[in-house]
């Protein structure tokens, strides 16, 4: 359910804005999206894992807040580009 360090570094290198960027909102959204995908797969198998389901909802809310921050700070174009890149729905447009 967690992300391996190699997968995390791969996501960081793919979504970073500049060299050495490991904590921008773009990178955080990418890491959160991967964690959400992992938990979703886990919940397909273990349908009654309510503790995990709550954790999933917390991660979804965190990602939504980060996406809203990106849209407000950087504009709709970069936000829509990130949403398309991550393969998630646009909830603010």
Curated annotation (Swiss-Prot):
BP terms from Gene Ontology: translation
Listed name of the protein: Small ribosomal subunit protein uS15
Gene that specifies this protein: rpsO
Listed HAMAP family: Ribosomal_uS15_B
Keywords linked to the UniProt accession: Ribonucleoprotein, Ribosomal protein, RNA-binding, rRNA-binding
The keyword Ribonucleoprotein belongs to this UniProt entry's keyword annotation: yes
Family: Belongs to the universal ribosomal protein uS15 family.
Claim: Ribonucleoprotein is one of the keywords in the record: yes
Disulfide bridges in this chain: none
GO molecular function, one term: structural constituent of ribosome
Subunit structure comment from the entry: Part of the 30S ribosomal subunit. Forms a bridge to the 50S subunit in the 70S ribosome, contacting the 23S rRNA.
GO cellular component: cytosolic small ribosomal subunit
Top-level division of the source organism's lineage: Bacteria
Pfam families membership: Ribosomal_S15 (PF00312)
Function of the protein: One of the primary rRNA binding proteins, it binds directly to 16S rRNA where it helps nucleate assembly of the platform of the 30S subunit by binding and bridging several RNA helices of the 16S rRNA. Forms an intersubunit bridge (bridge B4) with the 23S rRNA of the 50S subunit in the ribosome.
InterPro entries: Ribosomal_uS15 (IPR000589), Ribosomal_uS15_bac-type (IPR005290), uS15_NS1_RNA-bd_sf (IPR009068)
């Amino acid at each position: 359910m967690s992300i391996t360090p190699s997968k995390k570094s791969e996501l960081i290198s793919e979504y970073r804005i500049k060299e050495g960027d490991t904590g921008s909102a773009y990178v955080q959204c990418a890491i959160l999206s991967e964690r959400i995908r992992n938990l979703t797969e886990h919940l397909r198998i273990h349908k009654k894992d309510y503790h995990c389901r709550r954790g999933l909802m917390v991660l979804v809310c965190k990602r939504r807040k980060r996406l809203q921050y990106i849209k407000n700070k950087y504009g709709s174009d970069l936000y829509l580009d990130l949403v398309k890149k991550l393969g998630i729905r646009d909830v603010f447009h």
